Amino acid sequence: KPQILFLESKGYSIIPVTNGRDAIDRCKTERVDVVFLDESMPGISGLEALAEIKRNRPSLPIVMITKNEEEDIMEEAIGSQITDYLIKPVKPNQILLTLKKIIDNKRLVSAKTNSDYQKEFQQIFSTIQDHLDHKQWTELYKKLIHWELELEKSSDNGMKEVLNMQKQEANVEFNKYIIRHYIDWIKGKDKDAPIMSHNLMAEKVVPVLKADPNTPTILVLIDNLRLDQWRTIQPMINESFRMVQDDSFYSILPTATQYSRNAIFAGMTPLEISKQFPTMWKNDDDEGGKNMHEADFLEAWVKKTFHGSIKHQYVKITNHRDGELLENNIMNYMNNKLTVIVYNFVDMLSHARTEMEVLKELASDEAAYRSLSVSWFDHSPLLNALRKLADKDINLLLTTDHGTVRVQDPSRCIGDRETTTNIRYKTGKNLNFEERDVYAVRVPEEIGLPKSRLSSSYIFAKENKYLVYPNNYNHFVNYYKNTFQHGGISLEEIICPVVKLSRK
């Protein structure tokens, strides 16, 4: 046959058989990389042969060739996990292209991705050096994430190293940008400021509630969800929902739950919260949980924003059992105007990864951390709960409170006994530190933060630095190196996803 001669001329070795039974036998005894299976053969049908081959060799790629364009035949073949489907008459070049897709796909994708990134490398480098505004920084970060996810498909570690260097350069410049503008943003002096934690509800939730008051709005906040993690779980969400708006906001400093999430639900800076709710706000050195009053802050925000209460509910998920209850009760929230669901898993994963050796191995870098997050989300009660809402008329908002960064460079820091233990930021008095490694704020009120003592100040670790005390310095350097932490200044911690979804 001309197809066989053509493929042999391209260097492929062909095993021709005339019926399904022979195909099954040869697949058992020969080293076969791909099977092209005619749907109509003497003896058993192509679909029957397909099922038998798959039983023996589940991962073997099989391409079905047929002249039958009936939908049910195609659906049955696709349901049997064929790799591709060709309709007769089949040209030799079609078979060649299919082979390249199957056998050479990884190599070809890797080569093309590397080539495309190389072409864009200089443009990204130039962009990093420009004077970017907050929107341009977000776009640059999204572009870096895009290439990070693309290069994951490549086996060329050299290109990944180049991209990591670009990310580090970007974070150096991003830190300068944040330090230059942050005080003006918090004080409301910069009209071009990004959406931030304390005005996220006003900018993203209020417009939805006012534009569509009769449709239930559900806000899901997955804590500690980086933008790249969102990108990897997004395809699972897209299966059930239509993306209406894919946006982002900037977390306030410190990029830590007690600050950013309380600010989100109160709709005010931590300094304003501490003044308005002095018994509810907890400073770092106070005892007790720091996020125990989110429902109270939300209640106060709703009353203030809507001049009276609307039917709303706050739900917090901190373990798998809570998640299962959420999945079972999700339809009850359709009776609320606003439902806020805080899902705590990713933050727990981040902290556990620091403390558990097995998780250090499972999430050794960003790619592994993303993979672990995808696996969790795919099997989580949260995804099951969202799927139950997929055909309902709702406004679904999904966001986070802050991101996280893999720390790699230790920086010495000295404080007194009251100084906080977080290794990405510190607050206390008499702080000694390496000036070049941190953003130091000696008047916390300037950036909307309360102080627990008259002389308290804050320092925030830059880029991928982490703050380590001199006592047992080497032990803690090694203990925390390459762990995921938050509280400081980096693209990964500050630029957060906020998306609006609706039913398809």
Q: Across the structure, where does each feature detected by a protein language model lie?
A:
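Active-site beta3 strand of CheY-like receiver
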Residues: 30-36
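Two-component/phosphorelay signaling modules centered on CheY-like receiver
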Residues: 1-15
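Short amphipathic alpha-helix used as the core "switch/output" element in two-component signaling
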Residues: 25, 47-58
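Feature captures the catalytic ectodomains and active-site-proximal regions of enzymes
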Residues: 5-6, 40, 64, 75, ...
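C-terminal output helix
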Residues: 90-99
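Acidic catalytic/metal-coordinating carboxylates
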Residues: 18-22, 45-48
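Conserved active-site segment of CheY-like receiver
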Residues: 65-69, 89
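Alpha4 helix (beta4-alpha4-beta5 surface) of REC/receiver domains from two-component response regulators
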Residues: 48, 69-84
